[in-house]
Amino acid sequence: MAETSPHARCLACAFPFWEQLTPEEQERLCRFTRPVHYAKGARVHSPLESCVGILLLRSGQLRSYLLSEDGRDVTLYRLFGGEVCILSASCVMDAVNIDLYIDAEEDTEALCISAGIFRQLMQENVYVRCYAYQLTAERFSDTMWT
């Protein structure tokens, strides 16, 4: 069923949990995925905005950073084509509470998965939940050691 979606192949390649999803879950994930474009310099996510969703970068570059009270920023990590931006939907993870900013450093094309649907899948499917928390832990680990 999900194979008829234009995004199914891309999602299947990007997410190691794809084969652990039921056909209905695959179809739901595809149905609530949409292409997005961010121009160079655009704000993708901030603590003041609603939850963007999970971003699968097709091309371009995003920078994730924190802002200090005096306005200085600290880059946490950068994401490139083929990578998944999980913290653009940190609202789906109860254990993650961070005032994160994400900007497009280059024109960026991505697929955006609805935060609400991803949250539902995390609640229903342990493979999705493990993937989300593992990817978050890897991002923070990379930040600590670079």
Predicted regions and their residues:
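Cyclic-nucleotide recognition modules
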Residues: 78-141
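Compositionally biased, intrinsically disordered low-complexity regions enriched in proline and serine
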Residues: 39, 66, 132-134
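Short low-complexity stretches enriched in small and charged residues
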Residues: 9-21, 32-35, 57-70, 115-119
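Cyclic nucleotide-binding regulatory module and flanking cytosolic helices
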Residues: 1-39, 89-92
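Short, Lys/Arg-enriched, Trp-marked, Pro/Gly-tolerant hinge/linker segments that flank
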Residues: 143-146
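Alpha-helical structural elements of signaling/regulatory helical domains
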Residues: 21, 71, 124-128
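Cyclic nucleotide-binding regulatory domains
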Residues: 43-105
